[in-house]
Amino acid sequence: DDLKELIAFPSVSTTSNREISDWVAERLEALGFQVEQTRYSDHRTVEKVNVVGRRDPVTAAKDGPPGFAYFAHTDVVPADEWTGPGGDPFAPVVSEGRLYGRGSCDMKGSLATMLSSAEQLSAVGQRGPLWIVCTADEEVGFVGAKHMVKHSAAYRDLVAAQPICVIGEPTELKVVHAHKGIVGMRITSHGR
């Protein structure tokens, strides 16, 4: 089960996400995706990895859709005071029909769903390209996304294609067209 395997990676933002990113890349390649990984070191010199996977349809529809892109992140917040079932937040536990573990909601559950969807939809059935994008350091300032924008050729290709995008962040099971985020600005005011 993909979700159980994803939860088992202790990919806390303060540590490297290399192992989970390599696992995602291998899983995408097994599903027929071409994969690009971009690596960087964070401010503590910890290795971080972003993943962009793209699978083209076997037969592209003429004037077909621009494609579909799923976005996820591989890091989770620390689990210092784990109150879920079991004693280890990175050992998935099923209790009363629910799966518990660090990241099961934000956002390893969404990533597992994305991988399952890609597996269910064969490249033969696709009408446009399919992307799955995973960034590092979303929980600590979106550093992975910023790095990907500057250094990923595969991401630039995705942007140029203007696909329909879904970001799998938790929204209490409601479909939303916008979500909380962050904006940085520099404002200069000249007074008298």
Predicted regions located by residue number:
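Acidic/His- and Gly-rich active-site-bordering loop/insert found
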Residues: D1-R102, A123-R127
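Context-gated lysine
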Residues: K4, Q34-Q37, K48, K62, ...
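Intrinsic disorder/low-complexity detector
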Residues: V52, D56-V58, V77, K108, ...
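Fold-level recognition of mixed alpha/beta catalytic cores in primary-metabolism enzymes, strongest
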Residues: E96-L99, G109-S117, S122-R192
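Loop-rich non-cytosolic ectodomains and luminal regions
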Residues: C105
